[in-house]
Amino acid sequence: MSQEKLKSKLDQAKGGAKEGFGKITGDKELEAKGFIEKTIAKGKELADDAKDAVEGAVDAVKEKLK
């Protein structure tokens, strides 16, 4: 797992924990912040996955052109 993907997973977990704690305590602001952090981290993970897929496709094309 890449460093970026690991960081995204950890950030998702932290955001989810904040969101859950906010729900339990009734702290709507903390709940919202946690949700936002979790969502941003998931977006970063998806972007990293897309980058990896594009790099893999480019490498495959380069191999075929050799």
Swiss-Prot record:
Location of the region described as Disordered in the Swiss-Prot/TrEMBL record: 1-22
InterPro entries: CsbD, YjbJ_sf
Pfam families in alphabetical order: CsbD
Domain of life (superkingdom): Bacteria
Gene3D superfamilies, alphabetized: YjbJ
Family: Belongs to the UPF0337 (CsbD) family.
Full protein name: UPF0337 protein SAG0619
Organism (species): Streptococcus agalactiae serotype V (strain ATCC BAA-611 / 2603 V/R)
